[in-house]
């Protein structure tokens, strides 16, 4: 049994939750194809690293960054699906 899955993509959007406790990071390979996108839920438990594996902040992420996101196997059935981000690696 795998503990998590991963998705490779480009950051298309970064937004805050209503209460400000979470950030939503939408990734995909085609901004016009909503069916290829995933919405990652960032929390204080999410680890973010740069290409040299140095820990960085969520504020160091930008639209257009290419990333590998390791995320929970549990996803909503919405479009795009949402899942908890465990590790985000900037390429």
Regions found by a protein language model. Give the residues of each.
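Beta-strand/loop nucleic-acid-binding surfaces
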Residues: 35-56
């Amino acid at each position: 049994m795998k503990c998590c899955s991963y998705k490779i993509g480009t950051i298309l959007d970064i937004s805050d939750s209503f209460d400000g406790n979470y950030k939503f990071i939408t990734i995909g390979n085609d901004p016009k194809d909503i069916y290829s996108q995933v919405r990652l839920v960032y929390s204080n438990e999410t680890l973010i690293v740069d290409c040299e594996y140095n820990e960085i902040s969520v504020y160091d992420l930008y639209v257009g960054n290419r990333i590998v996101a390791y995320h929970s196997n549990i996803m909503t059935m919405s479009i795009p699906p949402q899942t908890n981000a465990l590790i985000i690696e900037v390429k």
